[in-house]
């Protein structure tokens, strides 16, 4: 009897998709959002307008559609990413609505910032679903690395010749709305950084001289770092956008360090940025004013210190447990719904509530870094780590700015601050991170291989003749 050999296919034990848990957490996020809205209405209007419950239903329906897209196109996505972002977005909508109520009482006009933000949430979730549908594999982005980099640079350069608005050249005005192209540049440039670092890794890891225990790069290999430095300083000087400059440069240094594991790149980068910032401080008036406001906002109230002072007063008023949703005085803070929304939460939720919000961001960042660790390809590792690090850096810049830990930069808080460009760009960022997460958690199917004939041969009894 002849035994036919069968190929053996080994399959990695599948992880549970956890899609039902994600749906349950989305419901929980919707309940918290509606409850926060009810508290604001009770404290501000002394009643609850029941039609607002419809907004809660619309809100949950939006994210349920995003959940269905994940279930259909990326079922192994980390189940915590979407619910946490939904909760952050929902709380941001509640606070923007709360600020609308204050503005209505003060000015007598009907403000609709919350409705506009809800519309941008719809656009952002639609973009999330579109990316999840179209982008079947995150490695496809590596093919367009140079195109992404060029497009990102164009987006950065477009506002430079346009008129200055609110102290910076970062906006492009259209009839009825405006966009901030730098929000999309950070994603495009991260794709470019990751693609180049994977394709040209030898350029960044070539050994140079040794100094104080560090391996320095060769002088001719410093061109990419110098290019990033020139771009960052140019944005800071010519567009007066310190936040984007700091965010892009710090993200580049993080990705370079993760790709090379050489501290020398980071140290050289920090030295270059410090030198450029110092020269800019003594050369350009707006940089000098920004630093003076940071050093002593109380004596520079007329040139930007007033809003920082009011932010500090809000944190002091909130204390440990806050004044309660709807019981604060956010109208005292200029740009409360954009640059200073963290200060508003700090006043009404206190240190405990603000720490909880920061913990939600921390979970998203940590899950993004875990995705980077679990991803099997180098491009996915660098891109996921870069996206997660960008969120962490942006959160640090925003939080540090409103507490005077660092100079105020004008960046917005992801998913919470008012602004369509920021919301849309961060949902695209989330979709890419979710796609990489699906790839990292998806069971790995190995190639079939033939087993040894000895292993499958049956035992035969041979009679002695």
From Swiss-Prot:
Highest taxon of the lineage: Bacteria
Pathway where this protein functions: Cell wall biogenesis; peptidoglycan biosynthesis
Membrane-crossing residue ranges in chain numbering: 21-41, 50-70, 76-96, 115-135, 144-164, 179-199, 222-242, 243-263, 264-284, 308-328, 340-360, 382-402, 414-434
Function of the protein: Transglycosylase involved in peptidoglycan cell wall formation. Required for the regulation of cell length.
EC identifiers of the protein: 2.4.99.28
Reaction catalysis annotation: [GlcNAc-(1->4)-Mur2Ac(oyl-L-Ala-gamma-D-Glu-L-Lys-D-Ala-D-Ala)](n)-di-trans,octa-cis-undecaprenyl diphosphate + beta-D-GlcNAc-(1->4)-Mur2Ac(oyl-L-Ala-gamma-D-Glu-L-Lys-D-Ala-D-Ala)-di-trans,octa-cis-undecaprenyl diphosphate = [GlcNAc-(1->4)-Mur2Ac(oyl-L-Ala-gamma-D-Glu-L-Lys-D-Ala-D-Ala)](n+1)-di-trans,octa-cis-undecaprenyl diphosphate + di-trans,octa-cis-undecaprenyl diphosphate + H(+)
Molecular function in Gene Ontology: glycosyltransferase activity; lipid-linked peptidoglycan transporter activity
UniProt feature coiled coil, ranges: none
InterPro entries registered for this protein in UniProt: Cell_cycle_FtsW-rel_CS (IPR018365), FtsW/RodA (IPR001182)
Primary location: membrane
Record key words, sorted: Cell inner membrane, Cell membrane, Cell shape, Cell wall biogenesis/degradation, Glycosyltransferase, Membrane, Peptidoglycan synthesis, Transferase, Transmembrane, Transmembrane helix
Name of the featured protein: Peptidoglycan glycosyltransferase RodA
Membrane topology, from the record: Multi-pass membrane protein
GO cellular component terms, semicolon-separated: cell division site; plasma membrane
Family statement drawn from the similarity comment of this UniProt entry: Belongs to the SEDS family.
UniProt record, GO biological process: cell division; cell wall organization; peptidoglycan biosynthetic process; regulation of cell shape
Subcellular localization(s) per the UniProt record: Cell inner membrane
């Amino acid at each position: 009897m002849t035994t036919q050999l069968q190929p053996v296919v080994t399959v990695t034990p599948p992880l549970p998709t956890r899609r039902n848990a994600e749906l349950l957490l989305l419901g929980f996020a919707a309940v918290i959002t509606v409850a926060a809205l009810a508290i604001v209405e009770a404290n501000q209007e002394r009643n609850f307008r029941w039609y607002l419950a419809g907004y809660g239903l619309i809100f949950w329906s939006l994210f349920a559609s995003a959940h269905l897209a994940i279930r259909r196109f990326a079922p192994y996505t980390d189940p915590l990413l979407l619910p946490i972002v939904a909760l952050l977005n929902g709380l941001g909508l509640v606070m923007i609505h709360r600020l609308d109520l204050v503005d209505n009482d003060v000015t007598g006009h009907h403000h609709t910032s919350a409705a506009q933000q809800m519309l941008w949430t719809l656009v952002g979730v639609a973009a999330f679903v579109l990316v999840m549908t179209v982008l079947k594999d995150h490695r496809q982005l590596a093919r367009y690395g140079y195109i992404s980099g060029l497009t990102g640079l164009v987006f950065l350069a477009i506002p430079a010749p346009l008129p200055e608005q609110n102290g910076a050249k970062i906006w492009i005005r259209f009839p009825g709305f405006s966009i901030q192209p730098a929000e999309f540049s950070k994603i495009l440039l991260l794709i470019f950084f990751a693609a180049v670092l994977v394709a040209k890794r030898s350029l960044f890891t070539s050994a140079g001289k040794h100094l104080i225990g560090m391996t320095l790069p060769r002088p001719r290999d410093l061109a990419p770092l110098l290019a990033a430095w020139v771009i960052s300083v140019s944005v800071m000087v010519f567009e007066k956008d310190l936040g984007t400059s700091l965010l892009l440069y710090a993200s580049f240094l993080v990705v370079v360090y993760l790709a090379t594991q050489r501290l020398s790149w980071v140290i050289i980068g920090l030295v270059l940025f410090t030198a450029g910032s110092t020269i800019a401080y003594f050369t350009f008036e707006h940089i000098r004013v920004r630093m003076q406001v940071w050093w002593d906002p109380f004596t520079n109230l007329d040139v930007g210190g007033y809003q920082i002072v009011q932010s500090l007063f809000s944190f002091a008023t909130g204390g440990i447990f806050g004044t309660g949703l709807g019981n604060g005085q956010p109208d005292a803070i200029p740009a409360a719904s954009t640059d200073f929304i963290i200060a508003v939460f700090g006043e009404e939720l206190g240190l405990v509530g603000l720490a909880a919000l920061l913990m939600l961001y921390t979970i998203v960042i940590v899950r993004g870094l875990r995705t980077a660790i679990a991803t099997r390809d180098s491009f996915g590792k660098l891109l996921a780590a870069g996206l997660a690090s960008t969120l962490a850096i942006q959160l640090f810049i925003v939080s540090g700015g409103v507490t005077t830990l660092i100079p105020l930069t004008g960046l917005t808080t992801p998913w919470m601050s008012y602004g369509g460009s920021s919301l849309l760009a961060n949902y695209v960022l989330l979709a890419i991170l979710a796609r990489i997460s699906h790839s990292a958690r998806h069971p790995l199917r190995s190639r079939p291989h033939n087993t040894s004939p000895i292993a499958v041969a049956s035992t035969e009894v041979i009679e002695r003749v």
